[in-house]
Swiss-Prot record:
It comes from Hordeum vulgare. Induction: By jasmonate. It holds the Pfam family Nakanori. This is 23 kDa jasmonate-induced protein. Belongs to the jasmonate-induced protein family.
Length: 210
């Protein structure tokens, strides 16, 4: 299993084996079962331990424990990232998060600077019943002074940063964000939340609900 990814992928075959869904199995069926299994097999606990251990190795300072869950019924492929303040620590962004898996990473503030952690990551998936793809944005800010915030949205493939510029996301969206964010597009739903303090979880759940 790739670094920073937790849980056994949930496929159509997984769903058929449960006997809970009528065939033919659809993407929504696979996504629905993944949502039901969000904490199955200790994968959520293992993802949390992973970021907790990264933070322990990192030491003192502002650090954001990022946890992303895929319940889209499709694979999320890493597309791009942006750092406004700080950087990812020790392990890369997960390259692929399959349906039913958690992805995890730690983002930390710039060393020796009076600045917090602020970043964004974009994952790409197929649009349901289409050959086209869409981009999922998950972004967070933990300023040196001020409140924490998250912002998420779903847009067309290649939206970032040519249409949704990083300056716009940071100065208009993140700076006016709260501790929760939700967006829907293409039938998908993206939900994000962040804790308080200088070391906390920032969580994103990407869904394809009925």
């Amino acid at each position: 299993m790739a670094s920073g990814v937790f849980g056994t992928p949930i496929s159509a075959q997984t769903v058929i084996a449960t006997g809970e869904y009528k065939e033919p199995i659809t993407q929504k069926d696979v996504a629905d079962y993944a949502m039901k299994m969000i904490n199955a097999g200790g994968k959520d606990v293992n993802a949390q331990k992973f970021v907790d251990n990264l933070k322990e190795r990192y030491g003192n300072g502002i650090a954001v424990k990022c946890l992303l869950y895929n319940a889209t019924g499709a694979t999320l492929n890493f597309a791009k990232y942006n750092d406004w303040h700080g950087h990812i620590y020790d392990t890369p962004y997960p390259s692929d998060i399959q349906n039913g898996q958690w992805g995890a990473f730690l983002h930390v503030h710039p060393s020796g600077a009076a600045a917090g952690s602020a970043g964004a990551v974009v994952y790409r998936s197929k649009i349901p019943s289409s050959s086209s793809s869409c981009d999922w944005l998950f972004s967070w800010t933990v300023p040196y002074i001020g409140g924490n915030g998250v912002y998420t949205e779903i847009r067309e493939e290649g939206h970032y940063p040519s249409v949704g510029s990083w300056d716009y996301i940071y100065n208009v969206k993140l700076k006016n964000s709260s501790v929760t964010s939700i967006d829907s597009n293409y039938g998908y739903v993206s939900k994000a939340d962040i804790g308080e303090g200088t070391t906390m979880n920032a969580r994103g759940v990407f869904e394809f609900p009925y």
